[in-house]
């Protein structure tokens, strides 16, 4: 079902309702043609509502599938982050600090000797 079909059905529903209103005005509410048209208009209304609800359900289903894929990707990222070893990170940070301190001492020693 496409948006085009939904618009087409809504227009049909509106035309059937207008036709019923015209027959009711010209022939009276109790005339057999008016009653028949009223039933037809109500049927069109139900069909239109069913199409609208189907469109909403389809949209919601697509949105939920997209969210499910996003959550799956986020879980994968979280699992990868959990695998990172905190001890390795702390060891690397200590090594960087040690190298930085050595460079600093070398620079200060070079400046003091001048």
UniProtKB/Swiss-Prot annotation:
InterPro entries: Herpesvirus_UL96 (IPR022614)
Domain of life according to the entry: Viruses
Pfam family, one: DUF2664
Family statement drawn from the similarity comment of this UniProt entry: Belongs to the herpesviridae UL96 family.
UniProt protein name: Protein U68
Gene assigned in the entry: U68
């Amino acid at each position: 079902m496409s948006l085009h079909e939904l618009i087409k059905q809504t227009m049909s529903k509106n035309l059937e309702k207008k036709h019923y209103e015209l027959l009711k005005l010209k022939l009276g509410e109790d005339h057999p043609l008016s009653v028949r048209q009223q039933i037809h208009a109500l049927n069109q209304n139900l069909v239109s509502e069913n199409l609208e609800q189907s469109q909403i359900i389809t949209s919601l289903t697509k949105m939920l599938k997209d969210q499910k894929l996003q959550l799956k990707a986020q879980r994968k990222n979280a699992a990868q982050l959990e695998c990172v070893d905190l001890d390795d990170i702390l060891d690397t940070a200590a090594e960087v600090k040690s190298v930085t301190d050595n460079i600093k001492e070398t620079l200060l020693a070079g400046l003091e000797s001048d």
